[in-house]
Structure formats: C-alpha cells, structure tokens
Amino acid sequence: MGVHSFWDIAGPTARPVRLESLEDKRMAVDASIWIYQFLKAVRDQEGNAVKNSHITGFFRRICKLLYFGIRPVFVFDGGVPVLKRETIRQRKERRQGKRESAKSTARKLLALQLQNGSNDNVKNSTPSSGSSVQIFKPQDEWDLPDIPGFKYDKEDARVNSNKTFEKLMNSINGDGLEDIDLDTINPASAEFEELPKATQYLILSSLRLKSRLRMGYSKEQLETIFPNSMDFSRFQIDMVKRRNFFTQKLINTTGFQDGGASKLNEEVINRISGQKSKEYKLTKTNNGWILGLGANDGSDAQKAIVIDDKDAGALVKQLDSNAEDGDVLRWDDLEDNSLKIVRHESSNATTAPQKRSNRSEDEGCDSDECEWEEVELKPKNVKFVEDFSLKAARLPYMGQSLNNAGSKSFLDKRHDQASPSKTTPTMRISRISVEDDDEDYLKQIEEIEMMEAVQLSKMEKKPEADDKSKIAKPVTSKGTEARPPIVQYGLLGAQPDSKQPYHVTNLNSKSESVIKRTSKTVLSEFRPPSQQEDKGAILTEGEQNLNFISHKIPQFDFNNENSLLFQKNTESNVSQEATKEKSPIPEMPSWFSSTASQQLYNPYNTTNFVEDKNVRNEQESGAETTNKGSSYELLTGLNATEILERESEKESSNDENKDDDLEVLSEELFEDVPTKSQISKEAEDNDSRKVESINKEHRKPLIFDYDFSEDEEDNIVENMIKEQEEFDTFKNTTLSTSAERNVAENAFVEDELFEQQMKDKRDSDEVTMDMIKEVQELLSRFGIPYITAPMEAEAQCAELLQLNLVDGIITDDSDVFLFGGTKIYKNMFHEKNYVEFYDAESILKLLGLDRKNMIELAQLLGSDYTNGLKGMGPVSSIEVIAEFGNLKNFKDWYNNGQFDKRKQETENKFEKDLRKKLVNNEIILDDDFPSVMVYDAYMRPEVDHDTTPFVWGVPDLDMLRSFMKTQLGWPHEKSDEILIPLIRDVNKRKKKGKQKRINEFFPREYISGDKKLNTSKRISTATGKLKKRKM
C-alpha cells in the first residue's frame, strides 16, 4: 500500500509519458501488489472474489507490456520484516472483525429482504373494494406443478458424454455379437427358444443393458426425437416394460425361477438341484466343448443324443436333393406352426440383389414370361404375440433429425438399410399357429415348395444395373383364397389415438417386395445345426442359431460432420435432401432444452478480460454452410491411426498457411512461434498434475499482505474499472480484433447494507501462496524473468534500479520512494498511450521533499511499518514537516507546551489549531517517536545485491495455450486471438528498428522545462517553506 495519501502529495509532479518511448526499456515490476489489486477489485455481482482473476489480469498486462516492447522483470515479496509483521497482526485482528461484520450485515440484509417480501405479499393479498368473492376450488392431489425447464452443466463429471455412451454401447456387442443386430431379435419368438441357453443368456443380458441406457441416445438426440414430453414419458415406460420382460426371461433361462415368460410356448425350465455326490464338467469333442448332464451327453458316437424326430433325416436329404436339382420353391408352402418374422422393407429400397449360385441364373427368365403355379391357400387360426425386440420400441424414426440434434446417432442400427424416402418403421406382430405339432413335418415339405416359387420372383433381366429392386409379378387366379393379412402397427400405432395409419401386408399382394436369395442359401438357413456341422461349418452352435434369425448389420450411414470417419462426396445426395424436407426437425420444448447449460451464470465471465466473437461466428457460419447440401461416406479400410494422421495433416497445412507471417527477427526477444495444433502431451500432463496438486494442497493465506484504507481500496476498484475499459479499446484498435462484451459491473445495489456487505467480503480475502505459484508459472511460459526478494519487493526494485539492472520501476506502491526508488511509472494500464512518470529529482525540486522527509511523512500518515498519528492527513503532515523541519522538533514542541499555558498563548494560529486537533484525537508522543527502527527499515532494507544481468526468453505459444486451457478453460483459438496478433506486431516493430529520440541527446530538464504545480494554497505554502529549507 505504501504511505497513506502520498500519491495525493506527489501527484502534481507526475508527467505523462508515451508508452512508445518505453520501447526496449528494462522495467522492474512489483508483482505482489498486482495480485492484491486483482483480489480486491475483481468481484462478481455478489461481492465474492472471482476465481483465477489474477491469472487473467497478469496475462492481459503482460501482453500489453510486450506489445509496446517493454522488457519486464517481476519481483515478488519474500520474507516479512519485524515491523511489518506487527502491522500484519493488527490488520488480521481488523480482518477478523470484518468477517464477523460481513455475517452480521448478511443477516440484516436477509431480514430486510424478508420484510420487503412479506409487505408485498400482504399488499397483493388485500382485496379491492369492488372485487367479487372468490370461490374456493380444491386442487387435484395428483396435479403436478409446471416445470419451465432444468439446467445442467455439460462439464459436470456426473453427466455421461456421448463418447462414454458410444464406448459402453460398443462394449455390449463385444462378446461374439458384433455382426448381430440385437434390435431385431424378439426374445418372445419360438426361434429364440430354439437357441442354446448360453446364447439366450448372452442376448438377454445385452438387451437388458441396452434398454437401461436409453438405447444410447444423448440428451440432444432425445430432444429432437421427442419434442413432446408425453411421448418421451411413454418411451421411458415402454423401456421399463421391456427391461422387466428381459429380466424375467433371463431368470427363467438361467433356471432360477419356473414359469413366467418361458410359458409362451408352454415350456417350463426346471432348475437343476445341486447334490454333494454329483458333479458337472465340460467334455471336449470334435466340435467344441459340451456340458455333460446325463448319460447320453453327445461326447462320442456311443453316447449320442437321441432325437425324437425320426423323419428329420429324411427331410434334410430331400431338401438337399431339391437344392441340387434346382427345384422351384413355393412361398405358400412355408406356413407351419413355428414363428415367422415379417421384415418390413421400404418399397423404394435399394438393396442389391444377391447373386444366384444355381443354374437358374444361366437360363434366366423374364418377369413377364414367368407364371406362377396356382396354390390353394388355407386360412388358419392365428394368434398374435407382441414383439419384444428393441426395434419395435416406442421410438419414432429419426433420420436426419438425429444428426442435426448435435451428436451422431452411433446406435441407430434399426434403420441402417436406409432408402432415399424412408417410411415409418413398423412393429412386427408374430403369428403362431394353434394347430397340433404333429403336422409340422408335413408343412415343412410345403414350405420347401413355396421357397422354390420365391426363386421365380427373384429372376430379373438386370439385377445390378438399376437402383431400385424390381418386383416379380405373380399370376394368381381369382378363385384363390386370400391369406389372412399380417397386421403391422407403427411405433406409435399401438396407441388408440395415434394418427398414423395401420400398415397391412398381404403375402399375395403384387407390390410386395421380395429379397432375392438362392435355394441353397435358404436351405442352409433351415437346415438343422447338426447337418451344418457335417458340412464342415466353422461357426459355433450359438452363432449358427443367431444367424438363423438375424442378418448382419449393414454399414452405418452417418451424416455427422464432426466425425473423423467421414469425408465429403463430390456429388450431392438428392435423396437425402428429399428426406430432410419430409422429416422436419421438431422444435425442442423449453423443459427439455440444452441451452440452459450455456446460459448458466459463470463467475469467470464477470471480469470479461478477453473475449472475441469473430472466431466463434466464423465457426458457426461454417458449420451452417457445410450442413447444407453436403453428404459424407464412410472411410473403410483405414485404422484409427491413419485417420488421425489425415486429419492432422489437414490441420497442420491450414495452420501453416495461417501463421506464415510469424517469422524470427531476433533471437534476443522472439523467435519462430510454433502455431501448429500439436501441443505436447507432456505439457498438458504437467499442467493437469500441477492443478491437481494445487487443488489438493490447503490454500493457506500468506503472511504478508497490504493494508489499504477504505478510500484507497475504493480507488483500486475504480482504477480496475478504468483499466478494463481501456483494455477493451486497446484490444479492439491495437490488436485489430472484434469488440468484446463489456464488463458486467456491480449489479443492482439494493441498499446500503448490500454495499457494506460487499466491502466486508473484500476486506476478508487474502492472497495465498498458490496464487503466486500460478503467476510465476505463467511468467516462465512467457519467457519473462522473475525473482523473489529477500524481504520487500519494492526495496528490491529500488536496489535493481540503483545497480543499473533496470531502467525504471512499475508499481503503485509509494513505499518505493522511501526505499530509494527514483524513476517510477504508475497507472501503466489506465490510459491507452500514456503513463504517469514520477522522478525523485522532480519531487525534490518541485515539493522540496527528499528521502528523509518522505520517511517522516510515513510516520505521520502511516505505512506498512507504522500506524501513523490519528487525525493527520496529507496537508497537515506536510505542513508539520515544513513548519518544524523534522519530527524531533515537532515532538519537542508538542510535549513542552502540553502543560505550559504561557507557551500556548504565544503560539500562532497554525500551532493552536494543530495542538487542538492532536489533543482531541488523544495523541501521545512518547520517547519512541520518531521511531529509529522505522527509519532504519527504509534506509537499510534487506535486499539482494547480485549484479548478474537478466535474460529474456521467448514466449512458448503451445505452453501458454495449454496453461490457459488448464487454468481458465480457454480453447486454443481464444488464446491465439491475443497471442498471434501480439507476436506479429512485435516482430513487425522489431524489423523496422528503433527510432532515436531527442531526449537521448539532450538532458531531460532542457526539454521539459519548469512545470507549474496545480496544488492547493496550503500545500503550496508548505512546499515553499520546504524548498527554502533545502536552499
């Protein structure tokens, strides 16, 4: 803080100096007072200290110093002198009182606010004279209050990111289910019951986990999918129902409970009871491992498992013979008592037909020439079983809306076979025959014949030339009996009030699309697993059964621009544009909006030191333009390393073009700045480790501190506001960047209590050692030297100036004059182009104050080493020095005339008024006044006398980026907005060279001349007396 009100005395002697004249000057900077200023002045709307404000403030000031070519040396406080330690003790007692005062003020403020609120309620509740009597209406007990919305922070560790969901969902398909679309599997089907228990357990476990994770969709995606909150609630309830079904099915499969979901086909799974004398072991066979639970466990030929179906072998032989002869299969012969999965395909599907492997491909058959055999269709009594697959969940088609929602739909496997114009996916209803099982084998023969008829419908002239699948038109007789249609409901069609129409699929319809397969492919699917093993199949039994009921997952067709796995196509996809028009993005409801997290109050933005909208606007506009009319394709055949290398090459080429004008001009000040986006991992790791260690340490306050008066602390706040406004202009004009948002100053002040509470909070905060370490880390990355003084930083700055290691001192602490400082620069960051310069020679010449007089003023006004005399202001103190010459004469005058009325009567008007003021303030001047210890502390401070010159390094751009990102969360682009233009301008100025000025050839006093002081009459009279004493 320095000497109280000393700047008011020395202020008239200051001269404005242009910042350009300080180019290439070595300046000692008192860093400790900077930290104190940021701690006291930078506050949020509630008066609390803004976290890391000292880092942002130092970063801003360092950039300005380097821009004007100033070479700074930062000096930090070290130990604490004995006299100052005593002052600190008294200050801490006062700080503790401030803390208690802050609590008391907060209670008063709360009581006042509650009183105001209570008065408003009473006032509003008073009925008017003309108002009618209000009728009481009971509120429904189930009526819930309206919730306008909720807020959350995207950086909250409790909120899972999209990458976390993607990793977790990918792990679900990691246990041999990579090529299986789990969403299409219906655990309630008969085919699922035929799978091995181990496979059923694996599938049910994956489905349970996937249903619990809301199928992997992010918040933004769900907002777009469900614009209505009621639809989202239905989706949640539907997921709970399916998860309960999966859980019950899993319990029944493992044998922990009988009955339940396993009774769909009237089979009960019995739990195996454990016995002490019985063991279960795995036996290795030629085809793998089997679990022996009985005598005929299938481990060898003698212990073969007996199959009840004696006709199965004959049936398979007949199937093989039909496949070899190329017989035609008829579709209506495939009806049996087992479950049929009806796959809904779009009429405009672009699925490529499979190549035929039999001789029917060579012969060929036009669709117009082929006629189908008339087959009698027998209606059957069927019952409908609900589809419990995830694909049939209550989830509408997302299409392009998911991509526009903000994150890629990496889990949408249900619509992978996408067509240019997709229709709404449907819920499949399986049908199960109610006839006896004895007719199964007879129906299988009819199924084979029906499959042969299917082959005729697959024959086309050019199956691979056209984009759309051609449909064979069968010829049927009018008398053919119609098959009962299979009803397919939409996802929301199960609701009675749904507006979506029902889709009815008739197997005799001419518009029904048929997927082409060969007879051998179909036979291979319907052949029992034992026969496939005889053919030398490599797949395990579980995989064979999974392939029996599911197809492989096709390639994903993402349109997410942010993904590294996609690149732009040269041709625009017209069909995707049509899809976007047909599927508009629904409006997000306010209660499900993600913008709330971005509108949360951030205390880091209250200071608003550095902000630019150019880069952000360019990114947003670029994102909008790339979203329009651009399509992407999946990069296959590349691993992650190759993809990252591609992206890195693109980024590096762009950065090189961007920063080509940054060149090395001199190794003394700057060198080439690496602007590639390749921050070393070690730097960021070190930053994270340092931050963690800092957070773990207890942030203890330092012993040293500054003691400002109330008026001086108010001036600090005003000066910081002026500095912020000046920096806005400096950043906008000098660095040629866009205007940033103005600083949010103190919000409304409700009353005097609120203002007093803010002052109390300001007084209670103290500088910590962690703050100093963070600032020193920032200086090292800028390449700026710094030292820690043995004791006082101001004394060390004055010593550096006397040793000619620096050319001036930048500080707002007036103690520097008392330690021997002669060239002081103050208010460096308040004006754009000027700074206040104070010279000890000018002060002596204009005010008549030398170093000894300044120390005597400190004992009257108060400083870090003494509390001063109560009631003594700057004018009275300088009048005392001018009237009595020194403090010893002043003490003799006061003590000798204290009880001598004769002397008091002979005193002049000034002496009478001064004595009256001292007596009213109960001033006692003892033998220790003036203090010799205070005089020695200022005249002979403990400093470092080392004469080693300082060396300035080169700012490390990558290290600065990582530091600002770690400490303040700044992205690299925001740091580059300040650093890159700064380095460019510095290099440009260095290239032009330094111009000689007239003050380098002539003494300064010949240029400036005598300056007329603008002081009060009393100070002018007192300084006149002082100057006469010096003559």
From Swiss-Prot:
Entry cofactors: Mg(2+)
GO MF term set: DNA endonuclease activity; metal ion binding; single-stranded DNA binding; single-stranded DNA endodeoxyribonuclease activity
InterPro entries: 5-3_exonuclease_C_sf, HhH2, PIN-like_dom_sf, XPG-I_dom, XPG/Rad2, XPG/Rad2_eukaryotes, XPG_CS, XPG_DNA_repair_N
Amino-acid positions noted as binding Mg(2+) 2 in the UniProt annotation, renumbered to this chain: D813, D815, D864
Location relative to the cell: Nucleus
PROSITE patterns named among the record's database cross-references: XPG_1, XPG_2
UniProt xrefs under SMART domains: HhH2 (SM00279), XPGI (SM00484), XPGN (SM00485)
Class of enzymatic activity (EC top level): hydrolase
Phosphoserine: modified positions: S118, S367, S583
Residue numbers spanned by region I-domain: 756-884
Residues that, per the record, bind Mg(2+) 1: D30, D77, E792, E794
Cofactor binding annotation: Binds 2 magnesium ions per subunit. They probably participate in the reaction catalyzed by the enzyme. May bind an additional third magnesium ion after substrate binding.
Region called Disordered, residue ranges: 342-367, 406-426, 459-480, 570-591, 670-694
N-domain: region residues: 1-95
A single BP term in Gene Ontology: transcription by RNA polymerase II
Compositionally biased spans, kind Basic and acidic residues: 459-470, 679-694
Main location: nucleus
Record Gene3D superfamilies: 5' to 3' exonuclease, C-terminal subdomain, 5'-nuclease
A GO cellular-component term linked to this record: nucleotide-excision repair factor 3 complex
Domain of life of the organism encoding this protein: Eukaryota
EC number, as in UniProt: 3.1.-.-
UniProt family annotation: Belongs to the XPG/RAD2 endonuclease family. XPG subfamily.
Alphabetized NCBIfam families for the sequence: rad2 (TIGR00600)
Descriptive protein name: DNA repair protein RAD2
